[in-house]
């Protein structure tokens, strides 16, 4: 049986805009009110996904959320026709309207935490949608995320889907952006690393002072319990609160792992050496390559600006590892110099490939944000909804779908345009037919 890691990228939705909703995310905040280009954003994401499929990787797509989210606006007291609701919200509560129009579900690293069957007690692949309670615009995603995941991984013999954690800050959960898995081979039991920013039940534990810690230890422990993980293959690491206060809002902005490699910044974690000793002990006899990037070579500021660590490390069919990096890494002299050096250091990482995902980057999400990793075997892949898997036909069809339905210019003021609801719902209704998802959206029920 073959084992591999698949990547499921989020399709950028028709309302992709720059509303600056994410406090603690420097790129999101600094580009607030810029005019976005949803068509280009979607095409950039598709191009990256297709390039990985062309490299021989298993690549899938996850559908976006329904936006504008009129159901949430109704729930908080706006009434009337769809157009009237948009108009009232734009006048009376523009910040709430912006939150209900976000295309942030494109960053599927926050969609869920995934544990492969090799790690779980019942031998199934487990999915728990992230509750994303720290940010209003993302906290309205989990139910639809669960619907989309269940329609994509739609076989109960192989896949187990859990409800998101209770919607309270004690269980703040940001999904796979704070989780990585190390393993010798994808089919072997691995070591799952859960990175948290604070302990909700321990007021004396370290926590950031300026920006919120979005992931709690309690949430990470709950996910491990739900997924049936053993203590022997689970490690909890505290993120350095100082780097959270410098704009490192998720662990995938400061570290990334793949198989036997953990690529991280010198300042990423607390109690680093003890935790790495625990990882190595639980990993077993084979060596884990801990690749540390020193502050002297790349500052936290440069790491956040370029998204050096929000890259994907993938294992190519040849067995070599490659980094999938945003072009912003090429444009930052310190980061570009480091990546050129990295491939000469004798680590498993042998090449770097650069992709333009600037529409996503300007809203605070690099290549790693755009994908949910699912380690699986060929039997499990055969059980996935095949209409969600990237190939020449799907790439052509989705590009044509984007051309047909997406605007090439969207300002924050445009979010109050009633036509946007019609355009978005028409697009998503057609998408559910292309990807054979069934009725995953509220407007379809």
UniProtKB/Swiss-Prot annotation:
Show the active-site residues. Answer: 174, 250, 369
Its UniProt entry gives the catalysed reaction(s) as: N(2)-succinyl-L-arginine + 2 H2O + 2 H(+) = N(2)-succinyl-L-ornithine + 2 NH4(+) + CO2
Instruction: Extract the InterPro entries matched here.
Output: AstB_sf, SuccinylArg_d-Hdrlase_AstB
Q: Which NCBIfam families match?
A: arg_catab_astB, PRK13281.1
Function of the protein: Catalyzes the hydrolysis of N(2)-succinylarginine into N(2)-succinylornithine, ammonia and CO(2).
State the family it belongs to: Belongs to the succinylarginine dihydrolase family.
Report the SUPFAM superfamilies cross-referenced here.
Pentein
**Subunit architecture:** Homodimer.
Single Gene Ontology MF annotation = N-succinylarginine dihydrolase activity
Originating species: Shewanella woodyi (strain ATCC 51908 / MS32)
What phylogenetic lineage does the species belong to?
A: Bacteria, Pseudomonadati, Pseudomonadota, Gammaproteobacteria, Alteromonadales
Q: What gene does the UniProt entry assign to this protein?
A: astB
Binding-site positions, substrate: 19-28, 110, 137-138, 214, 252, 363
Query: What keywords were assigned to this record?
Result: Arginine metabolism, Hydrolase
One Pfam annotation reads: AstB
Q: Which HAMAP family match?
A: AstB
Protein name in UniProt: N-succinylarginine dihydrolase
Cite a single GO BP annotation. Answer: arginine catabolic process to succinate
Q: What is its EC number?
A: 3.5.3.23
Annotated pathway: Amino-acid degradation; L-arginine degradation via AST pathway; L-glutamate and succinate from L-arginine: step 2/5
